[in-house]
Amino acid sequence: MKKITIAIDGFSSTGKSTLAKQLANHLGYIFVDSGAMYRAITYYALQNEYINQDLFNKEKLIKNLPQIKLEFQFNPKLGFAEMYLNDANVEKEIRTIKVSNYVSQVAAISQVRAKLVEQQQQMGKNKGIVMDGRDIGTVVFPTAELKIFMTASAQTRAQRRYDEMSSNSENVSYDEVLKNVQERDFIDTHREDSPLVKANDAIEIDNSHLSREEQFKIVLDLVNNI
């Protein structure tokens, strides 16, 4: 079967990465969680105190972008690739609510997006890739053979995220997670550079009431019909 590019976009906590992993594993494709890359840069900014509740030193972050090395390394025990920031595994650190609170602000910086889009396009130049994010079908791979746009209610997404974080023993309330989801929705859809929008040729899937297996079957059928 001819290898294709699959772009999965959508709002935060819609299960984009879960679906992308399922598809990549089934098809033998490369899986790239583009959000992990933005989270890693956000974590870097937090660690270097470029961003907090009171300030955001964008100039310093932009100046230091060349010093940031991002790569995915496959973990055979987990069955997927983990994010490495300057040769350190930060997969767990980038999934915290603290990083979630700032990632949309970091992702709105044009220089950050330019750096990561270039790296993402290099990853997918030979096709056979499933990548999820906010601008994959509109900016990174505008000619992708299959584009999916995932959505669900903010409350449903917040509950999923809360359950996930609670299972990882992170001390966070549902209301805090819901507020974060709603704030990220606003920033993601209103930023000047590559706002979150559905590509004209993307297929929208509202998975508010779909199981993981149901949505996987829907998308796999789409892949098989290309």
Curated annotation (Swiss-Prot):
Localization, UniProt: Cytoplasm
GO terms classed as biological process: nucleobase-containing small molecule interconversion; pyrimidine nucleotide metabolic process
GO molecular function annotations of the record: ATP binding; CMP kinase activity; dCMP kinase activity
Cytoplasm listed as a keyword: yes
Domain of life (superkingdom): Bacteria
Predominant location category: cytoplasm
Stored SUPFAM superfamilies: P-loop containing nucleoside triphosphate hydrolases
An example Gene Ontology CC term for this record: cytosol
Record-given protein name: Cytidylate kinase
